[in-house]
Amino acid sequence: QMRFWFDKGIDGFRMDSISLIAKDPSFPLIDSKKYPDIFSFYAKEPRLHLYLHEMNRQVLSKYDCMSVGEGSAVMVDDVAKFVDPAREELNMLYHFDAARIRNTTLPDNPESGIDYSLIALKKMFTEWDKAVDKGWPSIYLGNHDQPRMVSRFGSDKDEFRALSAKMLITFLLTMRGTPYWFAGDEIGMRNIRFDRIEDYNDIDTINRYKKAKAEGKDPQAVLDEQKETGRDNARTPFQWDRSPEAGFTAGTPWLKVNPDYTWINVADEEKDPTSILNYFKKVVSFRKENPSLIYGSYHLLDAENPQSYTFLRKTGADTYLIMLNFSPKAAISTPGIDMSNAHVLLDNYGDRSHMAPQKDITLRPFEAIVFQLNHPVYESFIDSLDLLE
């Protein structure tokens, strides 16, 4: 079947739940109290890598193609087994640590306006980058199983939606690896936040609601929680223009269109040179024109900063400093490097033509800045970072 589609000319496969294809054929009895531990019986079973290697050897290696696997239950220590080119299995594998971060961590500083640990997020991306040093990372912040990217990691309030969407775009397109984009994030689509259970299609949301009612709990609490975390937030029709159903269909869509389609849509954003969509196009071109942002090494700076994410990308003589404020409040970042020869290449506010040399950099709410650094001191500085890592 894979050969059939490759012969038709497709470019690759996104392999759903690929880490679950090998099972324990003895079907052992498992203590129900150990439910969280049963991954070992249906995920990462030893024969999994034999199957993937066979798939590569017999099919994938015969075509100019791309393969990416969904890494359910795959931890950072396991990923190299999937993507190390020497093992001849997959090109890429995406994990769920980024998606879980808001549910598994507490804010570093509640006053920052960030409702998860940015320090943990930075550590997580850094560990995964290091783990696939011999392979290739997958970078994403949203997909069909997650709420909208700008609602989850930025702010969908009118004041900050465009700025935070542009900041997140800058992050994804300056990290090492292949960035994955979910349709609508390039125009800053937001969570729809349905008020009624009848408006939801997602079986997970519906089952949570039914379970709460059956157990005598407050079903409204489920609805309130799903407004922020529910998967249907990202599954509403794509917003093309201001026409009925956002120009997506002349029929009745599976979910209601987000009412904000009258001002968040492709047609309007294409006409606005300062829009999220045009910024997205600009940064895509910027990435293509600067290979260091694709293939360069990655080095985290100011790791314990609870508001900003600062890192270096480098290859050859080119060094770039990326500074991102993930919060709705001003942040001070201390990259710890000489900024005397730095110049601004890209910023999401659109008014940073230069930056005065200083030890501490003040970033405005959700600000993103990309600097180019060309100075001999950076060579020894980055070498020292390599030793620390």
Protein language model annotation of sequence segments:
Residues Q1-E389:
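Active-site and adjacent substrate-binding regions of carbohydrate-active enzymes
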